[in-house]
Curated annotation (Swiss-Prot):
Topology of this chain in the membrane: Lipid-anchor
Role description: The Vlp and Vsp proteins are antigenically distinct proteins, only one vlp or vsp gene is transcriptionally active at any one time. Switching between these genes is a mechanism of host immune response evasion.
Additional comment: Genes for both Vlp and Vsp families are on (usually) unnamed linear plasmids in B.hermsii HS1.
UniProt key word Lipoprotein: yes
Lipid attachment, kind S-diacylglycerol cysteine: C19
Secretion signal span: 1-18
Lipid-modified sites (N-palmitoyl cysteine): C19
Protein name (database record): Variable small protein 6
Pfam families reported for this sequence: Lipoprotein_6
GO CC annotation terms, alphabetical: cell outer membrane
InterPro entries membership: Lipoprotein_OspC, OspC-like_sf
Length: 215
C-alpha cells in the first residue's frame, strides 16, 4: 500500500508539471494540460482516496483469513516454559478452534461494513457478498457442523481436518476454508483494480469541449 501511495504522489506531480494556464477558464479544482485536456483534481483525488481506503480494509480481511494458517501450526502444541519453542500437547485443541471461530466472527463484522460502503462497483460489492457467504459457511461448520470440534479435547486429526490446509483428509470444514481463501483473493484483486482505475483517470482525462464559433 505504501508503494501505491508513492506512485499516486509521483503521478500527481507529473500531472502538475505537464499543466499550464492556457486554454479555457477553469474551476478552482481543475487544471489544464498542454494538450487541452482537463483534470478535476478534487473528484479524482476523492476517488483515489476512497478506493485506497477500501482496498486497505479488504487487505485487513485477507490478513485475518490468512492468519488461520498460522493458528493451524499450533495444533497439538503448548508453550514450552523453558524455551522459545513448543511442547507437544496432543488432542487438546478446543481453545485453538474457538480462537479460529472468533477470528471468523471478526471477519464477518468487517465484511458487513465493507458491503455498506457507498461508491463501490456492483462487481466489487458482489465479491464482498461471496466472501460473506463463504465465511458464514465456515462459521456454521466450525460452530455446529461437527460436534468433534466443539470440545476441549478436540483431537489433532479433527483440528487439522478443519483448519490445516495442508491436511490431505479433505474434511468439509477445510474445504470451506479453501473456498473462503479463494473468495478473499478475488475480492482483494478487484479492490486493487479499483485503485488502479482511479489512478488511470489522472493520465486519461476527458477532453475539454471548445466553445462553438458559430454566431
Amino acid at each position: 500500500m505504501r508503494k501505491r501511495i508513492s506512485a499516486i504522489i509521483m503521478t500527481l506531480f507529473m500531472v502538475f508539471m505537464s499543466c499550464n494556464n492556457g486554454g479555457p477558464e477553469l474551476k478552482s479544482d481543475e487544471v489544464a494540460k498542454s494538450d487541452g485536456t482537463v483534470l478535476d483534481l478534487a473528484k479524482v483525488s476523492k476517488k483515489i482516496k476512497e478506493a485506497s481506503a477500501f482496498a486497505a480494509s479488504v487487505k485487513e480481511v485477507e490478513t485475518l483469513v490468512k492468519s488461520v494458517d498460522e493458528l493451524a501450526k499450533a495444533i497439538g502444541k503448548k508453550i514450552k516454559n523453558d524455551d522459545d519453542g513448543f511442547d507437544t500437547e496432543a488432542n487438546k485443541n478446543g481453545s485453538l478452534l474457538a480462537g479460529t471461530l472468533q477470528l471468523m466472527f471478526a471477519v464477518g463484522t468487517k465484511l458487513e461494513s465493507l458491503e455498506k460502503i457507498a461508491g463501490i462497483s456492483d462487481e466489487v460489492r458482489g465479491k464482498v457478498i461471496v466472501v460473506k457467504t463463504e465465511n458464514t459457511a465456515l462459521i456454521t461448520k466450525l460452530k455446529g457442523g461437527d460436534a468433534s470440534l466443539g470440545k476441549n479435547d478436540a483431537s489433532d486429526s479433527d483440528a487439522k481436518n478443519a483448519i490445516d490446509k495442508s491436511d490431505v483428509t479433505g474434511g468439509k470444514v477445510r474445504k470451506s476454508l479453501f473456498k473462503l481463501n479463494t473468495a478473499v483473493d478475488a475480492l482483494l484483486k478487484a479492490a486493487e483494480g479499483e485503485v488502479e482505475a482511479a489512478i488511470k483517470e489522472l493520465t486519461a482525462p476527458v477532453k475539454v469541449e471548445k466553445p462553438s464559433q458559430n454566431n
